[in-house]
Amino acid sequence: MGRMEFALDLSIDVLRRTPGALREMLSGVAEPWARGTEGPETFSPFDVIGHLIDGEETDWVPRALLILARGPARFEPYDRFRHQARNAGRSLESLLDEFARLRAANLELVRSWRLTPADLDLPGQHPALGPVTLRQLLAAWVVHDLGHVAQAARVMAKQYKEAVGPWVPYMPVLTDHEVPRS
């Protein structure tokens, strides 16, 4: 299996697509699809969008700015459930709109930095992981996005776990294991 080296332009290309991919998947879906979860303290697709908005405001770009300031770049701990109280009573459509707007602005800002390879190697300090580089932070942003796109699809699929009856063993999205060979 191949592995990619980090490339900022390829990363931005994925990051710019995330709002549209999630909008295509979620816009206009019924509440049971949007609000279903995998159990206590797990995210629904609605929560995924709220969490991504919170990350746009408090995580990826603010942490990158700390690194680029070349000062003490110790990141504040991140509360992954902070978005829930703020988004109570909001519509999924309003969250999708806000996420798209914030992401576009953040990517415009990142492009304006004109990052060099030396910039990408600048250090930061994650509260749990220890030393990280700007390159690692930006790569993690991409993987975080892809993980949450997959999570939204997985959570939606699991709403039909009982409905598919005997097909469960052939649907790894429902069981988190490989498909048996037939």
Which residues are covered by each model-predicted region?
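Small-residue-biased structural context
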Residues: 11-15, 19-27, 85-90, 134, ...
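Alpha-helical bundle segments that constitute or directly flank the non-heme di-iron/ferroxidase center
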Residues: 4-33, 54-66
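Acidic/histidine-rich alpha-helical segments that form the ligand environment
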Residues: 18, 23, 80-122, 132-151
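Hydrophobic alpha-helical segments and helix-packing faces
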Residues: 8, 15, 41-45, 53, ...
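Short, contiguous alpha-helical
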Residues: 34-78, 121-182
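Basic/polar N-terminal segments that are highly enriched at the extreme N-terminus
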Residues: 1-6, 180-182
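A short secondary-structure junction motif
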Residues: 25, 29-32, 71-74, 113-116, ...
